[in-house]
Amino acid sequence: MIMRFGYVSHAMALWDCSPAKTMTFTSFQKLSKQEREDKLYDVTRQNLEHTIRILHYNIAHEIPLYRLSSSIVPLATHPEVEFDYIGLFTPLWRKIGALIKEHNLRVSFHPNQFTLFTSDKPHITTNAITDMTYHYKVLDAIGIADSSYINIHVGGAYGNKEKAVERFHENIKKLPAHIKRQMTLENDDKTYTTAETLSICQKEKIPFVFDYHHHMANLCEEPLEELLPAIFETWAHTNILPKVHISSPKSKKEFRAHAEYIDLEFIKPFLHVAKKVNHNFDIMIESKQKDLAMLQFIHELSAIRGIKRINSSTLQW
C-alpha cells in the first residue's frame, strides 16, 4: 500500500510566501478606479508568484499533493468587482501549469463552507455555482481542469436533513456538467456523516474525499471497515487515487478544531483500517503547521516497523 502526502496552501517553511494575500471590498471601494485595478493586479500577481515559489519547494521536497489557495485571486467572485484575472496573468497560469504537469503534481481546491447546494434560497445556489465556476476557470487557465478536483461539503440540514439532501440532488443539476465532473464531496464534523455523504456520492457519481477527523467528531452507526472500501470505490471511474484528509483535535474540549501537528495515536486506528483495505491512496494533511506537520508525521510513521519511506513524502506499508 502506497501513501502519498501533501498539505494545504501555505508552506510554513518559506518566509513571506503567502499565496492568499487579499483585500476587503471595503478597502476596494475607497480606491479610485485606477488604484483598484493596480491593487487587484499587484495582489494577484504576488499570490501567483508565491504559488510558483511554493510549487518549487514542493518539487524539491518530493511533495506530490498540494491544495491551491481559493484566495489566490482577491474578490474574484464579488458581483461588484470586474477583473480579468485569467487574461492578465496568462503567462503565470501557464507557468504554474507547466510545473504541475512536468512533475506530475496533484493539486486541488477546497472552497469555503458557504459553497453548498442544500439551501432552499436560490441565491445561495447561484453563489455556489459562481464560486465553483471561478475555481474551474482557474484550473482551466492552468491547463489541468480535466484532472484536478474542487472539493466541497454537502451543506446544512436546515432542520430537515432528508429535505436538504433532496434539494442537493435538485440544485446540483444546475451546476454545469463539466464542472460537476471535477467535483468531490467531503463528510463534515457536525451535519452529514460519512455514511450519509457516501450515499450522496454514490447516487451522483461524485468521488468522496474522506475526512477522518470529521468522521470521529460526527460518527455514524456503520463501521469504518465497511465504509472505507466503498469510499475508495467512488474514485474508480476517475483513474485517480482516492484522497483522504488527516488532522487531529486541538484538545478534548476543542475536539473539532485542528491541532498544530498530527497526533499519531489518534490516526493509528484509521491507518489500520486502511491497511486492511490495502489500496493505494493520497493523504492531505490539514494541521495548522501544514508542511511542517506533514513532514513530522511522515517521519513518525516511517519509524513504525513495516512502513518504508520511498522518498521525502511517500510511504509504503
Swiss-Prot record:
The keyword DNA repair applies. Keywords: DNA damage, DNA excision, DNA repair, Endonuclease, Hydrolase, Nuclease. It holds the Pfam family UvdE. One of its GO terms (biological process) is response to UV. It comes from the Bacteria. Its EC number is 3.-.-.-. InterPro entries: UvdE, UvdE_bac, Xyl_isomerase-like_sf. The keyword Transcription does not apply. GO terms for molecular function: endonuclease activity. Component in a DNA repair pathway. Removal of UV LIGHT damaged nucleotides. Recognizes pyrimidine dimers and cleave a phosphodiester bond immediately 5' to the lesion. PANTHER family: UV-DAMAGE ENDONUCLEASE. This is UV DNA damage endonuclease. It comes from Bacillus cereus (strain ATCC 10987 / NRS 248).
